[in-house]
Every structure is written in C-alpha cells, then in structure tokens.
C-alpha cells in the first residue's frame, strides 16, 4: 500500500520561466491542521506511517481529501 504524499505550493522565483514553473510540489509531510480536519492526531498518524510536518501551518483541502481517502482504504486492506 502506498502512503499519501502532501502537496504544497511552490515558491515563485524571479529567475524561473513561468511556463516551466509548476504550481505545486511534494511536501515534507502533512500539517497538524490537515490531520485534525481529517480526524487524526499526530500519534495515530505516525503509527499509520503518515509523515507529519510540524513546522507547516497551512491547511490545503486537497491534502485533507487525500488523508480521508487513505483512512477509508485502511479497513479494506486489513480484512
């Protein structure tokens, strides 16, 4: 089973061409706010193998949806 990855916004650099810039990149982990909106706490997320980035303060709705889908798939994998 593949663990979910968090998406975050990329910083804008003035030396990059706009057509080569991507809007999002893979982040270090999920923020605490995203975990709380998905119904998890830090300890349970780490037990499940989800990486937590405690420095991030932003909450992206896409990441919350990814976490909810991941949690729905867990009982199906165990049975």
UniProtKB/Swiss-Prot annotation:
Which InterPro entries would you find in this protein's record? Ribosomal_eL13
GO molecular function terms attached to this record: structural constituent of ribosome
Q: So where does this one cross the membrane?
A: none
Keyword list, A-Z: Ribonucleoprotein, Ribosomal protein
Which GO biological process annotations does it have? translation
**Highest taxon, organism lineage:** Archaea
Extract one GO cellular component term from the record.
ribosome
A Pfam family this protein belongs to? Ribosomal_L13e
| Keyword Ribosomal protein on entry | yes
Can you tell me which family this protein belongs to? Belongs to the eukaryotic ribosomal protein eL13 family.
Stored NCBIfam families: PRK12277.1 (NF008914)
- Name recorded for this polypeptide: Large ribosomal subunit protein eL13
Q: Which gene encodes it?
A: rpl13e
